[in-house]
Amino acid sequence: ARIKSTVNSNKLYNGSDKMSYLNVEFPGGLRVDARLKNNVIKTDQPVTAGGEGGAPSPFELFLGSIATCAGIYALSFCNGKGISTEGMSISMDIEKNMQTGLISKINMDLKLPEGFPEKYRKAIVNSMELCTVKKHLQTPPQFDITTTTAK
């Protein structure tokens, strides 16, 4: 079985206007891997959920994607201003809605490097708010899931 996620592209894939963006494979156990360009994104379920815990779960990668996206904006801001990023880090914690089990709030704390100019505190937060992953949560895409038979 193979799940294929597609996005619109100017390139043709199998005679259509859609191109495969990534392919998902099932290497065994509860592991699920995504092949994206020249990279493999490995996932597994925690031991408590029957997996081996050998890689982050898809949901952990989702949260990591949000934080690293904010991080690249913070990094780019500092690089653009010539500000050292030594000692800079982001920590994230989440608040869950106990009725739904879904996240109700994501909190990120940017630890600024020593000597970070006070006048740029708000600006670096504003740059992190531009994160594309976050924007997709605010305006979610339509999901279209289909099936085909493997040959």
Report the location of each language-model feature.
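Intrinsically disordered, low-complexity Ser/Thr/Pro-rich tracts
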Residues: 3-4, 129
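Extended beta-strand/beta-hairpin segments
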Residues: 12-64, 72-151
